[in-house]
């Protein structure tokens, strides 16, 4: 474990919004006087009607309720666009960089206002009203931002679905929130290849009947099927509307968006975020964590289909009047230098990406990085999963030339924004550590018996107090919200992550402790992959676990028991990978499949995943007691035929 410490560079301590003394003072106030602290921070957004109540929250069993600024009224789009028009109408709001390096666009705040109003008017003309749900299934093109902000402008609730998800996954998400409209494109572009988005929507809507309209953005000009009644081209509808659209006044606790995330039960959870607290927290974390100053060019490489794209491409930066970069492509297309060429092309100052991308680029060596300048960079960030110290060191040394601090940020879809992180002018850095809690965040590490651990320790990470960006419920299923997050440790929010706290009080995230795996920074419920495998006619049973993967952080390891009489073959293995890929999406494709005559089960029939994890990690020497299994002999068979052998 790395214990190398990097001091705060002197110029950072001088220039940053927050140095160490200021961090200590602000953090103490945020936990000792949360009402006063958050009342002041909430002034960073414009309120149509000011709030009088700051916090009204309860984590109590059977009474979990989270409300912030509840009697205030505001509009997110007005805060992200309209209020900036007086002073920065001609400043670039969004730099769009296409998949093809020859395509890029700069959109000013004035242009953003006009485009968002057009999209909002198109939706209003189709009878989309406050509270209606709109599913957005778009590539990383400016229209994705326009669509999200248009929904916010008129009070519709957006549900963005990542373009890599399959028609079945899309249908599930459309049905769960009963979307009235789907906004999509003819096709997407990614790494030089096309993605059949409209065809996927057509397939999804054969399974989901709730949708009235499908709005289609022209991206590639491909010939796609258009239903005469249901489908229409966005560019044609946009010609018929004006560039003025009044904002809908929203209560702070009115929903802003639903974002589906994998759960351990297999049914994706609709994480619900509301308006006021979310925007305050996204704006505040973006300013302090990235030390965003006027004039900075900021680039978060995420997709808007994930929460990082919501909070740190769109809402946080635009609330702060920032210039934010939106990238359609991938890190290695057309070459491994693409990220660094984009940084030089647009003079990016702040760069926020995932450890998966860093590890993949690290494998390509230093030369694709060092052949570019990167002189504009002053801060690097990491998000999505814990970053291993080796990748951190490479990122710091090669990409940042030992001059850019790294903010290694820990947070979740459910948290709305960053919760544990260094602040670049305040925090000494340890490679691999998320370091210290953000303002108002009270982490507690618990043992298996629900005792709070003090000092140096390892256990399960909980949060003792609410914060404004916290999710409010699982859409349509508050009982599941309480069960998932508040039942394991009553009175506390359980993150599902393991954590270590060191002697300096720094936090090190050790990974998921529930049945969710983190693949390339994206959460995938093992039950979802298992259900897909078992749906194959030749599979009788499946168990899925994570295992260490050099690039992705965690890979997907599947144990598959076949129907009687079915022979395990390489062709069947490939067929099962393709089956899951088609059913859920490429992100869920198993990396390793082990055909298993039987799975380790307790006498009550419960699969012992702990044992399967150890075998997948090639740690079979530490399996522990297997005598309680119904058939202990299964284990030696699995160990013998494991797919991930390092130790013979």
Curated annotation (Swiss-Prot):
Reaction equations catalysed: acetate + ATP + CoA = acetyl-CoA + AMP + diphosphate
The protein's name: Acetyl-coenzyme A synthetase
GO BP field: acetyl-CoA biosynthetic process from acetate
InterPro entries: Ac_CoA_lig (IPR011904), ACAS_N (IPR032387), AMP-bd_C (IPR025110), AMP-bd_C_sf (IPR045851), AMP-binding_CS (IPR020845), AMP-dep_synth/lig_dom (IPR000873), ANL_N_sf (IPR042099)
Keywords: Acetylation, ATP-binding, Ligase, Magnesium, Metal-binding, Nucleotide-binding
GO molecular function: acetate-CoA ligase activity; AMP binding; ATP binding; metal ion binding
List of residues binding ATP: 384-386, 408-413, 497, 512, 523
Positions that bind CoA: 190-193, 308, 332, 520, 581
Family from the record: Belongs to the ATP-dependent AMP-binding enzyme family.
Binding-site residues, Mg(2+): 534, 536, 539
CDD domains: ACS
Highest taxon of source: Bacteria
Naturally occurring in which organism (per UniProt): Rhodopseudomonas palustris (strain BisA53)
Keyword check for Transit peptide: no
Cofactor(s) listed in the protein's UniProt record: Mg(2+)
Residues carrying N6-acetyllysine: 606
Its job: Catalyzes the conversion of acetate into acetyl-CoA (AcCoA), an essential intermediate at the junction of anabolic and catabolic pathways. AcsA undergoes a two-step reaction. In the first half reaction, AcsA combines acetate with ATP to form acetyl-adenylate (AcAMP) intermediate. In the second half reaction, it can then transfer the acetyl group from AcAMP to the sulfhydryl group of CoA, forming the product AcCoA.
GO cellular component: a single term: cytosol
Post-translational modification: Acetylated. Deacetylation by the SIR2-homolog deacetylase activates the enzyme.
Record-listed E.C. numbers: 6.2.1.1
